[in-house]
């Protein structure tokens, strides 16, 4: 039976009770306290307007590690032709709005509900959610957002309206994080696209071990608008 969350924002059921697809619990809210509690436990929300809030902890877990990260040669060639500029934390609301509203191939609707959008904007104001923006002059043409805790970054969503803009955002983010000794980027579930960059599948238990180390060995709360 799927567990229902209580009013205690810190409570989540044991991860071993998750279904085979990673679904762990439903209900609760998207308060900063509950979201941060979830991320530190290896849990994230993923649902749509037709369901209650659903909480997931997949096994295996897909992550990018600095030692395995690679840029495919075809993407390297594409990025060399780009004339875009990249910023960080300059347009978080615009990025998450684009991620929520732009249509995607083979996807109906969006999992970034209005409540989800407002929750991550609040996390951004608190210094935990961050965005990468890709610009063509003054036009936002791509980007991504996610959550940073300690030395772990949890990727949430990306978008592009110009070719290769989201690829540039991902490569820029990874290189930026590795330069600050981040331990990994959590990609949650594998996709053909992310596996091209050297993503690794690890067990839930190994992920939790890495996560515990990452969130206790450094701080990533933004001290300036530009920093993680």
From Swiss-Prot:
Its EC number is 2.3.2.6. The keyword Ubl conjugation does not apply. Keywords: Acyltransferase, Cytoplasm, Transferase. This is Leucyl/phenylalanyl-tRNA--protein transferase. The gene is aat. InterPro entries: Acyl_CoA_acyltransferase, Leu/Phe-tRNA_Trfase, Leu/Phe-tRNA_Trfase_C, Leu/Phe-tRNA_Trfase_N. Pfam families: Leu_Phe_trans. Functions in the N-end rule pathway of protein degradation where it conjugates Leu, Phe and, less efficiently, Met from aminoacyl-tRNAs to the N-termini of proteins containing an N-terminal arginine or lysine. The keyword Transmembrane helix does not apply.
């Amino acid at each position: 039976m799927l567990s229902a969350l209580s009013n205690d924002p810190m409570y989540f059921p044991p991860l071993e009770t998750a279904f085979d697809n990673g679904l762990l619990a439903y209900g609760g809210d998207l308060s900063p306290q509950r979201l941060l509690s979830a991320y530190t436990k290896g849990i994230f929300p993923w649902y749509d307007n037709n369901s209650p809030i659903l909480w997931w902890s997949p096994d295996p877990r897909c992550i990018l590690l600095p030692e395995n990260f690679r840029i495919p040669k075809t993407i390297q060639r594409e990025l060399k032709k780009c004339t875009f500029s990249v910023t960080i934390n300059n347009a978080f609301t615009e990025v998450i709005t684009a991620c929520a509203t732009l249509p995607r191939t083979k996807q109906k609707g969006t999992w970034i509900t209005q409540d989800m959008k407002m929750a991550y904007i609040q996390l951004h104001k608190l210094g935990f959610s961050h965005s990468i923006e890709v610009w063509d002059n003054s036009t936002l043409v791509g980007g991504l957002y996610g959550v940073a805790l300690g030395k772990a970054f949890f990727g949430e969503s990306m978008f592009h309206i110009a070719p290769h803009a989201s690829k540039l955002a991902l490569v820029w983010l990874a290189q930026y994080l590795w330069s600050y000794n981040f331990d990994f980027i959590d990609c949650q579930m594998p996709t053909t696209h992310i596996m091209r960059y050297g993503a690794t599948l690890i067990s839930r238990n190994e992920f939790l071990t890495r996560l515990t180390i990452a969130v206790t060995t450094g701080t990533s709360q933004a001290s300036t608008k530009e920093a993680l």
